[in-house]
Amino acid sequence: MISKLRRTRGFTLLELMIVLLVIAILTTIATQQYLRYSYRARRADGQELLMRVANAQERYYATFNKYGDDPVTGDLKLGSATSEKGYYTVKITKTDLTKDYTATATPVAGNSQAKDACGALSINSAGVKLPALTDTTKNTNGRCW
């Protein structure tokens, strides 16, 4: 009996290289999307901190008819100037002694959120949030607010 030898078939080097190229492209796209999502998720930590400051300021204003200065130990008693997850710190500046304030949440230097295109987030006594949606240079990786 004569057995026929079959030619063993496999993948060619060119086919393997094409598959690896497709995997590399998909990995690059997925990584960029993941980074954008991560920045947006961590940005919520700073937004939450600013909203807590704004609420504390309004409570303080309702009682004393002026806005507070110190978010930690003094007027507002928030307990910490750092956000819950530690990505942002808050600073309050007052342009008028009693009538208005601006609270700014700045990313902590050295952590991954410091590279976010939105940078520092802020809210003032009128409720204006910055960076604004129309600021296209800051909103490149998702809406800042």
Sequence positions of predicted segments:
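Conserved G/P- and acidic residue-centered "switch" motifs that form tight phosphate/ATP-binding loops
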Residues: 10-15, 32, 53
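Membrane-proximal N-terminal amphipathic helix
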Residues: 39-66
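Periplasmic/extracellular, small/polar-rich flexible segments of pilin-like filament-forming proteins
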Residues: 62-145
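Alpha-helical hydrophobic helix detector
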Residues: 16-33
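Residue-level signal for short amphipathic helical patches enriched in basic/charged
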Residues: 8, 26-29, 41-44
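N-terminal leader/signal peptides at the extreme start of proteins
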Residues: 1-11
